[in-house]
């Protein structure tokens, strides 16, 4: 038996575990402080748990065995030394204990082979949460959508601590939008297939270019049928791609100022969430935290992945439930979500911007309420004075509103139409980017090149 005192252990939480297990009659073999000490066998069992949970063997890969490459990570001795911060003599004892723990007398073999094993941190331990998420998806689709206890429990586990999460730069993944922030303007486009529909919408752009009123709008990625939501983007060109206009249609594109502070969950930052600096791999609470962190890194892509039109009802169900949960969570107090555009991504180019969806509580536009109806007069064409010629030259004349109107007003509109920002795009062609695959004719599938 070999004993070590807490002061000879560099890792903070492991030092605490040694302190709890230390006995006065045990003398530390690595210093002369005379403090109570614990058996290094206990340290070895803790190290075994950490290696099994967070590390994987890297010295048994094809590149190492057949091509003599140096394994990724570190050998066992260095790994234990880095984990524990103990004197090298104590590390050697722990390595001996681990080899003893891993040896199977029945087979005469060690768990990690006879050679010196090398270990590297696992790229992800998110599978338990990933499995639970897939079960939740099936439960929502096949069992209960509303008041689903399985979904509520998992969503709280995944999202409940978002308010405390930080990215690799120490920034919150919930960002501020609105006055005096870096995000003050959102762009929104709407597609029209006739001039009459376009002209009608421009007569009340605050209402008809903004979010649909309750009970009218179609279901979307983050909202159910008839549930108001403002879908916009941080750059105008993204709006055109997102509405997927047919050739010959028109798009009315407008900028909306964010006029009050909003809190937006940035899905792009989920992939960069880090653990607190004081997190210890020896602390049992760290494993679920790492599982959650690794799952969050995948979740942003899941929630913003492209969805085929014929699968929208099925695949949007989960993202709609997530949005409902976030919108109603009192402690998080989230007004919307920022997520990557699935329609305007170019492999070799940085993204031009991102999509933004504002939940109902933050989707209202100033002057969109019923107050005398239309707010503007519109003329799409300019005509030659003395001839038959005409050309497309849209112009809008905003009318004065009735300031003494006593109807139902919006108490806290979050957006205001920038009146001079409206642009009409006539869609004359659509360009697609694709990757082609030649279908090879074969006599047997084993003959494929």
Task: Specify the residue positions occupied by each region the protein language model found.
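Active-site and NAD+-binding cores of ADP-ribose-processing enzymes
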Residues: 1-223, 246-449
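Short, well-ordered beta-strand elements within core beta-sheets of diverse protein domains
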Residues: 227-233
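Short active-site loop/helix that positions an aromatic residue
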Residues: 236-247
